[in-house]
Every structure is written in structure tokens, then in C-alpha cells.
Amino acid sequence: AFRQQAWTALLAHRPNVIRANASEVMALTGLASQGRGVDATTTTEDAAQAAIKLAQQQCCIVAMTGETDLITNGTHHYRLTGGHALMPRVTTLGCGLSALVAGFLAANQAHPLSATLAALACFSIAGSRAGQQASGPGSFQVALLDALYALTPDDLSSLSQLETLHAV
């Protein structure tokens, strides 16, 4: 109940981007989910239509993250793959990604969809690189920070994990 009240209050401010996992997107649209609280057992594919509906209802971008990310403004839809299997095992990575999205939005206010895509792509690339270095969740967290620090613009230009979806 508290979480739903908090979401309602936040949505009243008309955010430019909603960054959430699939279970959270399902809850925001009032659809049943297989997750409870932060348990993200609903897959991105299961919640794709809910994300599009939420983006259309709120006139914003929805960045639904999970094993596969779906980014939509209600009209244009993108799928991003990458990252690493350790990412869901590290607490606060979703919050960190939300902060990264906010930073990218602040730097590129005129193009919020591009800013959101770039933020998620950076996180995905850094997660993949961190996973190659880490031996577990603790070392992954540190390796992720180092990988984010080491990213260059060229790293984004070679991104092949981003797919434009014509229908979801």
C-alpha cells in the first residue's frame, strides 16, 4: 500500500522517465504480476505491453530493466541486451541506474529518449565488462564503478546490443 501511494504521488509530478523492473511496471499499470515488492519475477517480455501503455498514459519514457531492457516512449520501442548475470544479485544497482539516467537527462534535456538509451547502454556495457573481472557480487560492484569510469564515447558507437522494435 505504501509503495503504491508513493508511486501515485511521484506520477503526479509527470516524470520524463520511469525506470522500473517488469514487476514494478505491471504494478504501476494495475496488472497482476508474479513478483511481490522488489521480487522481479515478471520478465520484460511479459510486461512489454504494460510498459507501452504506461508510457502512453503518462506521456513519458519507460525504461523497463531486467535481463533484457525495453525502452519506449509509447510510440518508439527499443530492446537492449547485455549486462551480466551478477547484476540482479547486487542490491541498489537499479537505484544507481536511475541516478545515471537522471544525469544523462540533465545533460541532454532536449532528447530524453536518446539520453535514456545512452544511460542504459553505458550501464549494460559496464556491467558486461565488470562481470569479466568479478568473482562475485561484492567485487562486481567495485568493478562496475571502475567500468563506468573507464567508458569512452567510442564504447557507445560500437554498441550492437540495441535493437529497434517495430512491434511489441
For each feature predicted by the language model, list its residue ranges:
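N-terminal glycine-rich phosphate/adenylate-binding segment common to multiple enzyme folds
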Residues: 1
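Electropositive phosphate-/nucleotide-binding environments in soluble metabolic enzymes
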Residues: 4, 45-48, 95, 109, ...
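Conserved phosphate/ATP/ADP-binding segment of small-molecule kinases
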Residues: 4-77
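Short, small-residue alpha-helix embedded
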Residues: 27, 89-122
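Short pre-catalytic strand/loop immediately N-terminal to key active-site residues, enriched for Gly-Thr
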Residues: 48, 80-91
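Short, well-structured alpha-helical segments that form the helix of a local strand-helix-strand
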Residues: 50-55, 112-127, 144-145
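Glycine-rich phosphate/pyrophosphate-binding loop at beta-loop-alpha junctions
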Residues: 72, 76-82, 117, 122-136, ...
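Charged C-terminal helix
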Residues: 125-168
